[in-house]
Design a protein with these regions (language model features):
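ABC transporter nucleotide-binding domains
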Residues: 1-174
Length: 174
């Protein structure tokens, strides 16, 4: 039996020799240099390292995004056969929130405390007009079930401060 790594069609993310620099004190400094990784459909990947090692920068880069004051200086990021470093901002934005998402370390900081979870879950899909609000809400509840959130039919009506950090992270993933 072949593993998923033997089947190229299962390759979801292929980061090849990616390098990123940040601008500080009038010069560019390397932040990430020559990183390679592959992620296959169905796999889970965790990045572990010291504070300031570049984990968040690499996570954002995997979406084709670099922070203000940073730049890609080499390599490629292939997602579903497309090199994100070569796509226009418009094309990348079409992927963000629909095919690609980023779960921040501090999930609470990513949520608006004044809005219910369900509205924040569907916000990106609604802004891209992917479906009606009602359909997207039903889809969100189904995702809550798949993420094994408690009371998936009601949890979306809660505000971020009313759920745990782990539940917020799973909500972000949904």
């Amino acid at each position: 039996m072949k593993s998923s790594k033997d089947n190229k069609k299962d390759l979801l993310l292929d980061i090849k020799n990616i390098s990123i620099e940040g601008f500080s004190d009038e010069i560019w400094h390397p932040i990430i240099k020559g990183v390679n990784l592959q992620l296959y459909r169905g796999e889970v990947l965790g990045l572990i390292g010291e504070s300031g090692a570049g984990k968040s920068t690499l996570g954002l880069a995997a979406m084709g995004f670099v922070r203000t004051g940073c730049r890609f200086t080499g390599g490629s990021i292939i997602f579903n056969g497309k090199d994100l470093t070569k796509l226009s901002e418009k094309k990348k934005q079409q992927l963000w929130g629909t095919k690609l998402s980023y779960v921040a370390q501090s999930a609470a900081a990513a949520f608006n405390p004044a809005h219910r979870l369900i509205n924040q879950t569907i916000e990106s899909s609604l802004s891209h007009k992917l479906d009606t609000k009602e359909t997207l809400q039903k889809d969100a509840v189904q995702l809550y079930k798949e993420m094994q959130l408690p009371n998936p039919d009601q949890i979306g009506e809660r505000y971020p401060h009313q759920v745990s950090g782990g539940q917020l992270q799973r909500t972000m993933t949904a």
